[in-house]
């Protein structure tokens, strides 16, 4: 996540950036497959001694697909050709170990849970261009557990390990989004994908990344 903080005395804009994903949070993540600290936005406040009233905006960063490092439940995990393609094109390997990251389609249920526990005001979607390479794209919009539909994220790893994702499928787009710097330049199918995520998460997607360079960034709305 990223916390945007405006200093009231000197009017200096500062930002705080978390190092780990929300679902690794020791209290609100998929325990015991978590880290040893609070990785949600609130952890930044206690860690740095900042009052909640000083925070101007909380932004959450999501990839256009889902990844996980190490063990733990992963409802939308995929294998085979599609997983390998995403991993290779997106460079999804551990920064220090080089270990391949686990790959899955976008899990909107988990993402919506993350928006709640972090109190997100705004969302950044990265690596949209990676999805240029697929004829079909899936988004998990709910789960099925023991014949029942779940529209919430259960943090119990026993339940998570036995649920099935319910997908909404999108046609892939045959136009490249790589390095685009304007939302108007994105094709209509990719826009539909972004709009769907925005509607499900009920948080505005203000920034979209379409490549590794700084210039490959689309800013849709004023951030601060």
Regions picked out by a protein language model, each given a short descriptive name:
Residues 30-34, 48, 99-104, 183-187:
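Hydrophobic alpha-helical scaffolding
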Residues 1-7, 11-12:
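Single conserved hydrophobic/aromatic residue that forms the stacking wall/gate
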Residues 34, 38, 42, 48-52:
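Conserved catalytic-core segment of NTP-binding enzymes
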Residues 25-29, 34-36, 69-74, 135-139, ...:
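Short acidic, glycine/serine/threonine-rich loops at helix termini
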Residues 47-169, 177:
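A glycine- and small/hydrophobic-rich beta-loop-beta segment
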Residues 138, 148-224:
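Internal helix-turn-beta structural module
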Residues 21-22, 28-29, 44-47:
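Active-site loop-to-helix "anion-binding N-cap" substructures in soluble metabolic enzymes
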Residues 14-17, 24-25, 60, 125, ...:
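General beta-strand structural signal in soluble alpha/beta enzymes
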